[in-house]
Amino acid sequence: MDIVAHTLWAAAGATVIHRRRPLSRSTVLVTLVLAALPDVIHLLPIASWWLFADGSFDALWAYAVAVPGQEPGVPPLVGSLSHHLHCVMHSAPIAGLFTLALWWVRRTFWIPLLGWWSHIVIDVFTHSADYYAVPVLYPFTERGFDGIAWITPWFMALNYTALAAVAVWLLMSRKRPDRG
């Protein structure tokens, strides 16, 4: 799924949670950042190549919006680092270990992790074998589930229609101050 949709779904989820358990603005903000982060962090090696070596912004942009098989050429190390960062950030075992470690330290579940978890779960089903299947069981395997590619036009329309419907529902169902 695209970064904007990930962030909007996380915002909807945070709104629902906030209605039952008040969340601070910083908690919501970190949740939204973690919902987008898996699709951003793997660009760091390419951005570093552009900023500190002989890469270009055009290559970074082309990589960010590439479709399978049309990625720009990058140095092997840069490509490998980017690939493995993508795998790490979309891995349920790694997110699970991180969640357990944080739970052990804090003795409670850290709500912003729901942003990361929502990203992983959504991406498992919204990427196809032909469109960057998500390696949800990395590092045990790099294979992914063959879902529906989020970039498929009818699916994008359905996704944003669903987001709009959820937004309307959230607005219509919010508690209004008693004016009586």
Task: Indicate where each model-derived feature is located.
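N-terminal membrane-targeting hydrophobic helices
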Residues: 1-180
